[in-house]
Amino acid sequence: MLSKTVVASEQIVLGLSQDEVAITANFDGSQILLFGAIQRDAPEPDGKMGVIITIAGPSKPIAVRKKEKRFGIWVNNQTVEVDAAPSFYAVATNAPFSEILLDVEDLRNKISIERAIRSVGAPMHIEDSQSFTEAVIRIRKDQKLYQLLENEILVDQNTLFRTAIDMPANLTEGDYFTKIFLTRDGKIVSQFDTTIDVKKVGLERFLFNLSRQNPLIYGLMSLAIAIFAGWVASSFFRYIRHT
């Protein structure tokens, strides 16, 4: 799949190894290969060139709670709502992030992990609401859901580029918006957008739909499976004891 942006002097031509990720019962992650080229109808402009690729999963609000120990018991003390937190977010670059993108461009386009999420709804008495956002970032980085991949885009002769981004097994179903930015001296001069479709298939799709559309039947089926599994295990151990 190849597409291009419409830009006067430089164009991004992009290819994907796959534009769909299927989540099956044994899904353990996937790797997306992104490759492309920068087409020019004039000599290459002056200035340091940068290539940035982002992949953002579906965004959902999150209530982040801070626990505090009172009388020997951990209780929820403060809550801040993070209203835009991608379930997955990866940023790949061909050079250190700060060297190829100005902060004002990052602020405008929300490219860095820190800019990609925002928090609202912090009560007036909470002075460090930013720490709640930082907690979300820290936790999701540990889960490999948020990734900063500096110097991971290979650029050949300032024209061809490629990179691979690992997507973990615990992906959320939905559209994953992919953006490619071309920068000069930290300013964005070209951008291309596309989408990767992540969806459950087979048994995973059937069980997911059943749990949403017929929760009672799904619950009864789960209970029946649990009872049957317990009976099988009990029968097996009785057989072992008598042999």
Predicted regions and their residues:
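N-terminal edge beta-strand
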Residues: S9-N26
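Short solvent-exposed capping/turn motifs at the termini of beta-strands
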Residues: I38-R40
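A short beta-turn/strand-edge loop motif at beta-sheet boundaries
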Residues: A42-G47, L171-E173
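Extended, hydrophilic extramembrane loops/domains of integral membrane proteins
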Residues: N170-K200
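Short, aromatic-rich amphipathic segments at membrane interfaces
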Residues: D166, V189-L220
